[in-house]
Amino acid sequence: SWETFNIFNKTFGDTRHLNPEALDRLDYFTSKLKENGIYVDLNLLVSRGFTGADGLPVEINAMDWKDQQVLGFFVDEVAELEKEYAKQLLTHRNPYTGLTYAKDPAVAFVEIVNEQGLIQGWLGGVIDDLPATFEEGLGIKWNEYLSLKYASDQKLAEAWDGEGEQSSQAELL
């Protein structure tokens, strides 16, 4: 498929090592864009397919790469992998410009996540189809949030009309 050759080095079986050839292509391409006055948009999470070899539960292997993107919003290990990659890429020195991507003024902006969000994942049914290990983790995070937001079960019930449905006065997010 179109994402087979990408920034991750497949020889390691994970997505934690960068592919030197792909990185060189990116470096050269961005240097040529810069030479021609064209700014760069770096995307940190586009078609990365996480695997169990990344240190994640093996259930990740059964998920579509696009659906995996929602996990970074509530699975701490995925968020850490995203930060690790961001640091690797943004602190890498482009040999053609002599600058890191973090310091290169030709990098106009960096997209943390491309075309995905927690609400989008929920509306698109991704949340409903999560493997149990990730669904349980989301449930734990949700309950922690509710515990912090509402001082008691009674306050929670009042805000959600005691029926599990949020009242018109309560905040959804």
Annotate each predicted stretch with a short phrase.
Residues 1-173:
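Active-site mouth of glycoside hydrolases
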